Amino acid sequence: MAHGGICTIRRAMSILLATLVLSACTTNRYAKTNKQYKQQLKVLTKQMQAPLPYATPRLTATYDSITGMTAVSEIPQTKREARQVASIHFNLRKPNYVIIHHTAQDSLEQTLHTFTVPHSEVSAHYVIGRNGEVYQLLNDYVRGWHAGAGKWGTVTDLNSISLGVELDNNGKEPFTEPQIYSLLTLLDTLKQRYNIPSANFIGHSDIAPSRKVDPSAFFPWKRLAERGFGMWPDEVLMTPPENFNPEDALRIIGYDTRNLDAAIKAFKLHYIQDDISPELTDYDLSVLYSLYRK
């Protein structure tokens, strides 16, 4: 074989080797956190298999007819595990909400780093990159740390009943078409798998109006609602009656109205989008009335 041919083969082999090394590094980049994830699942499994609580001590009450007072005393009881009679009627608790976020970071790599370092104490079930690639960080049945302090209707612990979906977006730019396409596909899967009601697809700002503004006004909520993910007002709007109370309507929809201005701004970020001031125009009231009637 000619010397030039040998050099060509060597260059090709070098490129192939470099590609394999790079691929291996990419695959193993999160090997440490993947291992920690599995270890944490084992810990949770042990917690589920732990003995039931000890029986509580019995109390006895003695009435003194002379003083007219009742004395309560504790009967000593040997600690023992409560009796267990295992029922066969159970399954895993399933998520009932999906909360959509934008990452407010400048790159997918930065977001994945944030979600995999120990000190951040924040996570989501899914992250969708600008190119539409979907990353699953948590099993759907695991309680993620994405909602934080928030409230929707009477629910005050959204983390326990929701899935968190993060979109790689800094909050100042439109969402990409591949990203939204992947999101719609993912939401369709989650909705069918867990029978999540259409109204239960909401944004982070909806549940935490005093402190969150994601997803931003660029987010296509109407497009999602047309596919069955979230609410949207009717095309033909009605003028609300004179006795219509917007604060009550916001509360009935689900918003936390303890800070009314913040609730109005969150509502407008979701449904109006081109104006997120705390004042309600006639148009805003008609939109709110349409949603309230649903």
Residue spans for each PLM region:
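Active-site-adjacent loop/helix surface patches within enzyme catalytic domains
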Residues: 32-91, 96-195
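Short alpha-helical segments used as structural interaction elements across diverse proteins
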Residues: 7-8, 133, 265
